[in-house]
Regions:
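Active-site-proximal beta-alpha core segment in soluble small-molecule metabolic enzymes
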Residues: 2-4, 8-11, 16-19, 30-179
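Conserved PLP-enzyme active-site core in the AAT-like
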Residues: 27
Length: 179
């Protein structure tokens, strides 16, 4: 049942989405992977509908915050790769593997936890390594004198049994601030 208590809403023009996708694709080139972030219901814009459009357009990946968001996309017919940017409890690793969902790993403790659980389940979990480049966000710290230790930890995580490291990323949450 639709709520009539709110007086504001957003209407997403999927033709405009397609135009913007093609503009970005031209800008970065066909050899660069395209990941559409649709977390928090596409920031309130309808994650399933936007994801279907991006899948049809040829995007390579989607990103969400949590396993429940990823499961909603799978239930909505999304078959393309999905990356979970947030934490997933270790007891859900089998679901990640079974649903072909990629998990972000932001520290050695999580890498070890996911590795142990994937091995216990008899599967392989695809992961992307999250790097903190000095903005005090989650991730392996590789700035401010931590480069050698951080990269060593990343290399160790990439070699853990039960994990298949596919990508690496960072998050410029406040990139316009000087520090």
């Amino acid at each position: 049942m639709e709520s009539t208590l709110r007086r504001t809403w957003a209407e997403i023009d999927l033709d405009a989405l397609a135009y913007n996708y093609h503009a970005l694709r031209r800008r970065v080139g066909a050899d660069v992977k395209f990941l559409g972030v649709v977390k928090a219901d596409g920031y309130g814009h309808g994650a399933v509908q936007v994801s279907r459009a991006l899948q049809t357009l040829g995007a390579d990946y989607l990103a969400v915050s949590s396993l429940d968001e990823a499961m909603e996309l799978r239930a909505g017919g999304i078959t393309m790769p999905i990356l979970i940017l947030g934490h997933t409890p270790r007891e859900q690793v089998k679901n990640l593997i079974d649903l072909h969902i990629t998990q972000a790993v932001s520290c050695q403790a999580k890498a070890l936890e996911y590795s142990q659980e994937a091995v216990r389940c008899g599967g392989e979990l695809t992961v992307h390594i999250k790097v903190d480049t000095g903005m005090s966000r989650l991730g392996y710290l590789v700035s401010g004198g931590h480069f050698a230790a951080g990269t060593a930890d990343i290399c160790t995580a990439c070699g853990l049994p039960g994990l298949r490291a596919e990508g690496i990323f960072t998050h410029f949450a406040v990139s316009d601030e000087p520090d």
